[in-house]
Structures are given as structure tokens and as C-alpha cells.
Amino acid sequence: MSMFCYQCEQSAAPGGCTVQGVCGKTAPVANLQDELTAALVGLARALDVKGQTKEGVDYLMRGLFMCVTNVNFSEDRVQEFIDEVNAYHAKIDSAAQNFDWEQLWKGEEDIVSLRSTLLLGMRGMAAYAWHAARLGFHDADVDAWFIKGLVEFAKDHSAEEWLNLLMEFGQINLKCMAVLDKANTETYGTPVPTTVPLTVEPGPFIVVTGHDLHDLNQLLEQTDGKGVNIYTHGEMLPCHAYPELKKHPQLKGNFGTAWQNQQKEFVDVPGAFLFTTNCIMPPKENYKANIFTTDMVGFDGCAHVEEKADGTKDFSAVIERAIELGGYKEAQEFTGINGGHEVTTGFGHGTVLGIADKVIDAVKAGAIKHFFLVGGCDGAKVGRNYYTEFVKQTPNDTVVLTLACGKFRFNDMNIGEIGGIPRILDMGQCNDAYSAIQVAVALAGAFECDVNDLPLTLVLSWYEQKAVCILLTLLALGIRNIYIGPSLPKFFSSNVLNILVEKFQLHPITTPEADMKAILG
């Protein structure tokens, strides 16, 4: 069976994956995800005609999220969701037709490129919107745009019209990141700077990976007083900085590095693993029985924790497995990829803007000469050590803002401070690009200049679709001279790439030395 997928950075050359996904996705799953996408387009068209419903928008968010890279590998789960979408579609408008899924990737090259970019960006935004929705937070414009975007996807547009839609979407995604920031901070408090150990203590433990704070909070509440420790993994690291989460003493530290190392790091580990979102890799038999998935995540053969009608989840099976495994007999001192034994997080916009006067004074005094935002997705492709070397080469009078799992390339390094300000400031998860934007806007206001005139350079790494929606937001805000790597998206046609280079001065990364020289002169 053949397939087509080119949505992630590791897609097979030259044009994408056609037999099996490099991510591990099979052709049947890839085709079912295309079928699901077409069903979502059909549902959106029905909602556009019959009127928006909360349940309908939830289906759109969840379905798009299910198609994000490394979220769901289960044929049964995807098929079940397609059936649910089609049943709801028929309930509200039995006459409406689904989009032909075989047409998803067909057409004139540049149009398909732009249309694909919108679809993939919407998949990324759906993840953010769904996390906010689970905490009871919505934005009316964001909800409406899930319908609009999918409806537009089935229409014919010129290249210019598609570009305009991409810029409109970028602004909508900014609203989406804002509502998720509000959901997280109003529910769990404003993140505070927190040092997180990489040591695993003796006794039973659960490693929580993904992005979902709501799931982690429920697990923490269910493990209170049970002698089971909790460790974050990957993009869950920033959870240590939220006051309402860190008040649980069993939230001990962070396990492992970024997602792509799990097939090595999870082997022979006597603990349970809970996947709340991506990135799950096909688990090895050595630890498959210790894997639990929930929400949109799925992998055949792994236990799945369903959400109950009241919105809660019972994680007792995960807890029981951790107790059964028993954990380590003695403390295990793990390190980051550079040998560090601890990392620091919690420098979201609430914290950084709280010391804005100190930062501004340091810039005016010449103590801080440049800011870099070095972050985004990590991945397995050779060449991602670029980001480690780039940060190592940043001058001592510069500050590195970082976010998402790309930070694991360097977040265990100690590169010093400037006047008490750490030179590496971890702003949080990938959605906390919102924090970086707020800091940039505040600095521009303080110095009475445009964001593009600040001594600030964005050096981004990408892997999956949340990086796509963030990039579109940055472009929609008019931010120029962004460096992106380790390779360019295969869904950018040569003409579309030329437009992005000419209009937005988008730069493919080269070498740390050459790029640093180009940036700083």
C-alpha cells in the first residue's frame, strides 16, 4: 500500500514518505489520517451552513490534533474517530458531502504547497486550542477559524489569496497561544524560575511526557501520599515552574532528554510512562508494557486511559504499574547531553517582564548587546548539533532565550550570567513562543523601535506542525530575518520558498560560525 506524507522535518527525500513514515507511521494509518482530514473538511462545511456548535468545533480540534506527527499510530483509534466525525456530520446535515481525501495533495505545485502549509499550521494550532479547551478556555475567533480554514481548504484560490489566508491564520494562532497562556497561568499560576534535577530517586515512579498540564495535575493529585514519584520528560519540563503543580512534593525532576531519544532512554527503566500528547515513537518490546497513552495519543498494544464523561481520568492503572515495577533501588544520576546534572526553567513573559527594567538597563549599559531566541523542535536528523554549537559560540554579552524541546541540545550547559540574569532563559513549551513575542514587543516599546530593529535574532529548529503555526504567526507579525533548520520544509515549493525568502528574509541555517558572523558582523 502506498501513502503520501511530507508534514515533518524528517520526511523522506526528495518529496516525502511514500511507503512508510520515517516517524514510524504505516501507510494504512497515513491514509486513514488523510481520510480523517477530508471528513473534517466535510464537517466544517456542514457547520458553516448549519451553524457552529461546541461539539462540532471540538471534533475539528481533536481530529486535526490526531494527525500531528507522532501523536497516533493506531489504525483502530483513527478509524473510530472517523466514524464519530461522520456520524456527527450526518446528525447535523445528512445531505452534506465529505471532501475527496485523494485530492488533498493534488494540484498545481505552488497551490498545493500553500494549501498544505495552511492545513499543517491548523493541525499545530489544534493542539494548542485543545489543551486550552480542556482547561475550559476558548477564543471565539479561534473556534470560528477552525471552520473557516477547513472550508477554505476545499475552495480554489490564487497563490496570493492563499498567502493572505496564511497571514490571517498566523494572527489567529497568536490569539490561540494567548488563550492557552491564559489557561495555563490562571489555572496553575505564573511560572517562576525553578532549578530541576536530572536525578531519579529510589522507589516507584512515573515519567510523564507530552504537553498536557491538565493530565499531569490529575496524576499528581492521584499520587499524593502514595509514595510514587513523578518525573517530567521532554516538553513537560516547564511544568516544574507552575506554582500549583510544583506544590506536590512527588514532582521530583526531569527524566531523559528530548523525544527522539526515548527508544534508548526508556529501555530497562523500572518505571511507567504516560504519553499525554506527541511525541511517541514506536515502543520497543522491552518497555512497551510500561507505556500508557491518553487523549489523542494512540499506539496499538499500549494501554490507553480514557477520559470520563465528567472530564476526569483515572490513572490508577499507571500508578499500579509503577508500584509493580518498583523503581530503582538507588538514586540514578542522569545528565543532559552536555553532561549537566540540572536544568532551569520558568522564565516566561511574566518573569522576564518582571525584571524588564534590569534587562533594559543592561542593554543601555552595553552589558547585553544581543538577544537570541534559539528553540523549537528537536529531532533525530544529523545536523541538529548545530544548535548546541551555536549557543556555545554566543558571545558572553548576549542572552539566549529558548523554548520547546530544541532546548535539550544545550539547556544543561552553564554559560554564565549577566548582572544576575542567566544567559540561558528557558521560556517554556513550544506554545510559549507567545512569551517570547510578548517580551520582544515589550522591549520594542521600551526602546521605541520596531521589533525588527531590536538586537534580537530568531534561530529556530522545527520538526512538526506546531512549529509551522508558530512560524506563520511570526511572519504574520512582520518579524524578519528568521533562521530556520536543520532543513527546510518539503511542503515549501521552490517558488513559495523564494517568496518567503524575498518577502520575509527567511534564512536556511548554514554553519554556526557563518550564521553568527552574518548576525553579529
Task: Report residues per predicted region.
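Anaerobic metallocofactor- and corrinoid-dependent redox/one-carbon enzyme cores
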Residues: 2-12, 17, 25-29, 33, ...
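Long, compositionally biased, glycine/small-hydrophobic-enriched stretches that function as flexible linkers
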Residues: 2-190, 195-203, 207, 227, ...
